[in-house]
Amino acid sequence: MKKITTLVSLCLSILCNAQNASVEKSVLGIQTGFLGIWAHNESRLSNKIALRSEIGFDAGYQSGFFYPEDVFFLAPVFTLEPRFYYNLNKRNSKSKVITNNSGNFISIKTSYTPDWLVIANVKDISIISEISFIPSFGIRRNIGTHFNYEAGFGFGYKYIFAKAAGYSKNESEAIGNIHLRIGYVF
């Protein structure tokens, strides 16, 4: 009887450890960082891929000849970002926490910043709408059960809709992205 009990226990423990790690079905949260505040939702597309949708405010600062004073502003931003979490199985096999998609990821961050509802310390300020595509690398780790932090970087392309603001032609440029955020998951 002892041999059967030991054998059944061993088989059950092997089956429990053989499960593949997967991203969460849905992760809803808020984050803040040095340059803004955002609300996000990550929805599972496959075991390793999640689609992050985000709405928030990016912060900015402008000064110079065209501005009578230094301008600090918050502009709305809408982001779609497919994320590939590539090390969930490795983290799971080492008994590290993978809840709320805690792991390393690569992504393509696609953001649109319109000239709507710009909040600033100067009246009647407007920004030029833009869209950006930034391949990125990042990590997310949990701090307790509901808090997390994220860090990442990437380089990509930004297209500026300058003609809509009265300029003679639209512009495009290379852009870098570095982010460090702390957040709360519901």
Describe each region flagged by the PLM:
Residues 1-24, 182-186:
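Bacterial Sec-dependent N-terminal signal peptides
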Residues 26-30, 47, 51-55, 78-80, ...:
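Transmembrane beta-strands of outer-membrane beta-barrel proteins
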Residues 76-93, 174-186:
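Outer-membrane beta-barrel "beta-signal"
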Residues 20-73:
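Start-of-domain marker
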Residues 61-72, 112-127, 160-172:
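Flexible, solvent-exposed loop segments that connect beta-strands
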Residues 32-36, 55-61, 84-86, 110-116, ...:
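Transmembrane beta-strands of outer-membrane beta-barrel pores
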